[in-house]
Amino acid sequence: MFEEENAQWGLVHALVLDGKGGARSIARTELDDLQLQPQESLWLHWDRSHPQTQTWLRKSSGLSEFACDLLLEENTRPRLLPLPDAELLLFLRGINLNPGAEPEDMVSVRIFAAANRVISLRLRPLRATDELLVQLADGKGPKTASELILYMAQYLTNKVQDLVTGLSEIVDSEEEKLDADERYTPEHGSVLQIRRRAAGLKRFLAPQRDIFAQLTRIKLAWFCDDDADYWNELHNSLTRYLEELELARERVGLVLEAEDRRLSLRMNRTMYRFGIITGIFLPMSFLTGLLGINVGGIPFSESPYGFMIACLLLVSVALGQWWLFRRLRWV
């Protein structure tokens, strides 16, 4: 309702959670005089690159200068930082699903959370927040501030699952093609991209998994009783996805090794055949060379059957070599 008006202030979404799974939008101008009911919570989602966002955060948010500096940092890694007064900073990463972007170029979302207030900042759009808005519009969204950050982490993790499944299916397909066709050559560029993508995802997801483990142990007064169980489940899910990413990297290595072995075997066979052919024709070339030298005359040069005799001699030598190679099991 107020999105266009709020956008000029850098405010992407401003919502008051009603404590029942729904939410109502508010305008940026209502923030200064906003009075929340006991069951309500405020969620402000800002565009970090907007100048008004930085101005509001430092002058009107009530956050410490230390917290503002961290929220506005250019480059961050997933981290969890408890603050005084039962507040916390939570930095997470999500899969980049924006058009033309690489998924492993993960999108950062920075979150300040307190008992009845959540402030989140992003630079690039996040699908996770869009899905969260749909849930709130249907009255099935988070009811409290603690549930809000939990839902956001859950949607971010679900996107990881979709990408990991897609990478595993690509590796499955390459393995099946290699098994079905000995002459199949995998596309090295696409296969290596899987390895690079898995490495890029692991860089941010590994510390994010540790953060979820930390959140299972944090006991803040405004956390719900079962929040720890949900954070633990997210930790287990992300651990499984990281294991699948590592497995995908190893399987890509095995695919490339199998292709290298096939190429090496094919090359060895080719060189072996050339060696056999050379072994057969080398003595024959030696004999024809001897027949061609003009020392004491050319044998059989006066005989009308000389050429035929020379040919029969060469054929006999070739057959003798073939028999010897067969006897030695070289062919």
Can you describe what each PLM-predicted range is?
Residues 1-224, 230-233, 237-240, 244-247, ...:
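Peripheral, non-transmembrane regulatory/ligand-interaction domains of membrane transport proteins
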Residues 236-331:
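Hydrophobic alpha-helical transmembrane segments and their immediately adjacent juxtamembrane loops
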